[in-house]
Curated annotation (Swiss-Prot):
Gene3D superfamilies: 1.25.50.20, 2.60.40.1910, Neutral Protease Domain 2 (1.10.390.10), tricorn interacting facor f3 domain (2.60.40.1730). This is Aminopeptidase N. One of its GO terms (biological process) is cell differentiation. Residues 44-61 have a biased composition (Low complexity). The active site is at residue 386. Residues 1-8 are cytoplasmic. The lineage of its organism: Eukaryota, Metazoa, Chordata, Craniata, Vertebrata. The chain crosses the membrane at residues 9-32. The gene is ANPEP. GO terms for cellular component: cytoplasm; extracellular space; plasma membrane.
């Protein structure tokens, strides 16, 4: 699954833009927030419980000794196959509810004698069979025991069938159920999505099963290791199209008794996990092609989006990416077709359902007239991510969610390889450094981080499972796999990977199985020699949290490692069998020339002539940041690197010019180097035109903005940045002939975006005038947008920040009319840039109304408002006032809660804010925090670290910016 909370290159820069002109006292307001008018009458999303016969067990009556009161399924039964028929109703019934009806037959084998059948079920209302919620029969000559009673256990989400005698080991049985569920708009399980086609509201039925919501669609053994085959049949309105993981067995046939309905039966799936199931009923249309291996490729979307060719780019890159992965894995694509569909309402970024991949519209659709280059990059990388899963995750699947990083980290790494193959001139692989490596280090430097592989007993509940879908699993997983591939070499890595996939096809694995096959590849060749086994090296990166800071003393050649912590005074309570020491691959250059590779072999320190520098020499480690660690040097070597950057920066690779900035700012945050050293590392940027170093500076200085944009430091800081950015702003003004052309190179395009956003956000008059002029031109002729798609996020934000209600209302109206979600995203984020409190307050209230802000966009809208210095306190008050409602509407397992908490607390740096955060935690213990539980603990830790850092550095930073303005 792609990350659900996506920020494009341009939109990410809005974090710098928001609140630029608002360093004034913020007026506290008492706000009455509009309440959402729930289409389903706020009945929750559960259908009524069965009226007679069975019982419903609540949390207050649980007996923990009973297996149905535990979150993990017993291993007494294993499913073989399912036959599932579902009928979604796309108009509301007399009670105003959208529902679906269904029936299911699950065939399973008894592995150990048991007198109870425990199967997952969530928010389903069952039709009784002879007074029970299910019917049981034996297969062949097997006699099934009689059912004693049935019950629904709400807390653990089970349908429990108690038997009068035991099932026999080795025997096969079938259990039948008939049920009804709500086709809610909650983005989970079998749900409905709505969109407008002109003035007509359209409704479709779609799915999102990962991680624990297949059970909301039909009763099933809903764990990844409980693989089975599936026969899916959909009964649907005859004028709509039905899709599922497999192709239809044949044409749809009329439904008996109602000629307005059709029946579509699909081919049997391969053995697969429940979370990869998908089925959709809609009037969507497609564009299609056939890959060289006869795999049918189709891109589905709203009919107008298809007619406008918004799916063509996705179609054009899908075939090459599928071919790339088939070669990369040395394994053919396992299915006869590859459908991909863009959904108007979707909680995640995308989902790798086998053969029917679902996407947010902004991750699949592209319009060259209104989409930016970063939108295009988003499409190709997300497609590559999801198609990578068709083998790694779908064909071979994790045994349990505690190893989620193996699925998502791997896909997050190879997405860059697949996208690079489809777009070879873009240098996409380099973007992993800012997008993943350094972004995740900010979280992994906290004592509240967690290892990649979390102990299985810590991951049981749906909320705990959802917590695993975090930046550690995705970005740290990708970073350490990239490091592994680098020190093995890509060819050797691919050999081990192919062996792993071929050995465990249609099975479940743990990370240890991958290490074993990579080790076999190492042992079958002679050129690559490792200091220890693959497992011994990698266990230190996967079984303990965090990462090392490598410190080099070039006077003595001493090299040492230490667990890097954002707050060095914090206490690490999670023990590590490796004592937070790593086996570290070290690459280095001396005076720009490569040196031989070196391993720091799990010891705290060592000494080597590689790292000893003469008076005129400088040494730099971690070339192209292929290792997952940061580097510190003695003061003299830092000065030599700074001098090199000022005089002949080309002797340092571009990625390492960015690394010098990232590492030094992180080290300064952790009190390991003076903050002035980090700031001095930005002086060379006045002559730098490359994207990566500037992105490192923009990203690193954003922390300074968050800490100081409510203080007297911010004015001198803006003056410094205005002076630094002016040369690159003028460079791109000239290169693009006064912003009328687009730079040819993708990285130059991103550098141009950075230049304009940094210039405008720090008050460069030429940039502010550019934004105002372009936006006014658009307002004067709304049918013709003169702003290049690459620049729209920046121009929209700055124009709205400079303007008032007229500009805001114009942008809001354009948002309502936007036909492409990429354009809507830009406008929705820019609306948070206003400096008018009442407009921000009104905008916040819109997030509670899904008719104004879609549920999938509510979290990112609130966090955009919180990024604005004026909106931050409003957003925080809003979250505190509405936490219970938000939690009930989105559910404790929503991926959005961690992003929400992170977004509204990023600026916290005072004792008062810490007190408020602690009170928020205490006051909502009864409601809970769901998938945001760890994020809340991390917010508390970050706030404490921020308080200490500001106290220590405020005066020093103020004086530095004054001296360099």
């Amino acid at each position: 699954m792609a990350k659900g909370f996506y920020i494009s290159k341009a939109l990410g820069i809005l974090a710098i833009l928001l609140g630029v002109a608002a360093v004034a006292t913020i007026i506290a307001l008492s706000v009455v927030y509009a309440q959402e008018k729930n289409k389903n009458a706020e009945r929750g999303t559960a259908a009524p419980t069965s009226p007679t016969g069975p019982t419903t067990t609540s949390a207050t009556t649980l007996d923990q000794s009973k297996p149905w009161n535990r979150y993990r399924l017993p291993t007494t039964l294993l499913p073989d196959s399912y036959r599932v028929t579902l009928r979604p109703y796309l108009t509301p019934n007399n009670n105003g509810l959208y529902i679906f009806t269904g029936s299911s037959t699950v065939r399973f084998t008894c592995k150990e004698p048991t007198d109870v059948i425990i199967i997952h079920s969530k928010k389903l209302n069952y039709t009784q069979h002879s007074g029970h919620l299910a019917a049981l029969k034996g297969v062949g000559d097997t006699q099934a025991p009689e059912i004693d009673r049935t019950e629904l256990v709400l807390l653990t989400e089970y349908l429990v069938v108690h038997l009068k005698s035991s099932l026999e080991a080795g025997k096969t049985y079938e259990m039948e159920t008939t049920f009804q569920g709500e086709l809610a708009d909650d983005l989970a399980g079998f749900y409905r999505s709505e969109y407008m086609d002109g003035n007509v509201k359209k409704v479709l039925a779609t799915t999102q099963m990962q991680s624990t919501d297949a059970r909301k669609s039909f009763p099933c053994f809903d764990e990844p290791a409980m693989k089975a085959t599936f026969n899916i049949t959909l009964i649907h309105p005859k004028d709509l199209t039905a899709l599922s993981n497999m192709p239809p067995k044949g044409p749809s046939v009329p439904f008996d008794g109602d000629s307005n309905w059709s029946v579509t039966e699909f081919e049997t799936t391969p053995v697969m996990s429940t979370y990869l199931l998908a089925y959709i009923v809609s009037e969507f249309t497609s564009v299609e092609s056939v890959a060289p291996n006869d795999v049918q490729i189709r891109i589905w979307a709203r009919p107008k989006a298809t007619a406008d060719n918004h799916g063509l780019y996705a179609l054009n890159v899908t075939g090459p990416i599928l071919n790339f992965f088939a070669n990369h894995y040395n394994t053919a694509y396992p299915l006869p077709k590859s459908d991909q569909i863009a959904l108007p309402d979707f909680n995640a970024g995308a989902m790798e359902n086998w053969g029917l991949v679902t996407y947010r519209e902004n991750a699949l659709l592209y319009d060259p007239q209104s989409s930016s280059s970063s939108n295009k990059e988003r499409v190709v990388t997300v497609i590559a991510h999801e198609l990578a899963h068709q083998w790694f995750g779908n064909l071979v699947t994790l045994a349990w969610w505690n190893d989620l990083w193996l699925n998502e980290g791997f896909a997050s790494y190879v997405e860059y390889l697949g996208a690079d193959y489809a777009e070879p001139t873009w240098n996409l692989k380099d973007l992993m450094v800012p997008n993943d490596v350094y972004s995740v280090m900010a979280v992994d430097a906290l004592v509240t981080s967690h290892p990649l592989t979390t102990p299985a007993n810590e991951v049981n509940t749906p909320a705990q499972i959802s917590e695993m879908f975090d930046t550690i699993s995705y970005s740290k997983g990708a970073s350490v796999i990239r490091m592994l591939s680098n020190f093995l070499t890509e060819d050797l890595f691919k050999k081990g990977l192919a062996s792993y996939l071929q050995t465990f096809a249609y099975q479940n694995t743990t990370y240890l199985n991958l290490w074993e096959h990579l080790q076999m590849a190492v042992e079958n060749q002679l050129s690559i020699r490792l200091p220890d086994t693959v497992s011994a090296i990698m266990d230190r990166w996967t079984l303990q949290m965090g990462f090392p800071v490598i410190t080099v003393d070039t006077n003595t050649g001493t090299i040492s490692q230490k667990h890097f912590l954002l707050d060095p005074n914090s206490t690490v309570t999670r023990p590590s069998q490796f004592n937070y020491l790593w086996i570290v691959p070290i690459s280095s250059i001396r005076n720009g020339q490569p040196q031989e590779h070196y391993w720091l072999r799990g010891e705290e320190r060592n000494q080597n002539e590689l790292f000893k520098a003469a008076a005129d020499d400088w040494v730099l480690l971690n070339i192209n940041v292929t290792g997952y660690y940061q580097v510190n040097y003695d003061e003299n070597n830092w000065k030599k690197i700074q001098n090199q950057l000022m005089s002949r920066r080309e002797n340092i690779p571009v990625i390492n010019r960015a690394q010098v900035i990232y590492d030094s700012f992180n080290l300064a945050s952790a009190h390991m180097v003076p903050v002035t050293l980090a700031l001095n590392n930005t002086l060379f940027l006045k002559n730098e035109m490359e994207y990566m170093p500037w992105q490192a500076a923009v990203s690193s200085l954003n922390y300074f903005k968050l800490m100081f944009d409510r203080t007297e430091v911010y004015g001198p800081m803006q003056n410094y940045l205005k002076n630094q950015v002016e040369p690159i702003f003028l460079y791109f003004e000239n290169l693009t002939k006064n912003w009328t052309e687009i730079p040819e190179n993708l990285m130059d395009q991103y550098s141009e975006i950075n230049a304009i956003s940094t210039a405008c956000s720090n008050g460069l008059p030429k940039c502010e005038e550019l934004a105002k002029t372009l936006f006014n031109q658009w307002m004067n002729n709304p049918n013709v947008n003169p702003i290049d798609p690459n620049l729209r996020s920046t121009i929209y934000c700055n124009a709205i920040a400079q303007g008032g209600q007229e500009e805001w209302d114009f942008a809001w109206n354009q948002l309502q009319q936007a036909e492409l979600v990429n354009e809507a995203d830009k406008l929705r984020s820019a609306l948070a840039c206003t400096n008018h409190v009442w407009l921000l307050n009104r905008y916040l209230s819109y997030t509670l109304n899904p008719d104004l802000i879609r549920k999938q966009d509510a979290t990112s809208t609130i966090t955009s408002i919180a990024s604005n210095v004026i909106g931050q306190s409003l957003a925080w008050d809003f979250i505190r006032s509405n936490w219970k409602k938000l939690f009930e509407d989105y559910g404790g397992g929503s991926f959005s809660f961690s992003n929400l908490i992170q977004g509204v607390t990023r600026r916290f740096s005072t004792e008062f804010e810490l007190q408020q955060l602690e009170e928020f935690k205490e006051n909502n213990m009864d409601v809970g925090f769901g998938s945001g539980t760890r994020a809340l603990e991390q917010a508390l830790e970050k706030t404490k670290a921020n308080i200490n850092w500001v106290k220590e550095n405020k005066e020093v930073v103020l004086n530095w910016f004054k001296d360099h303005s």
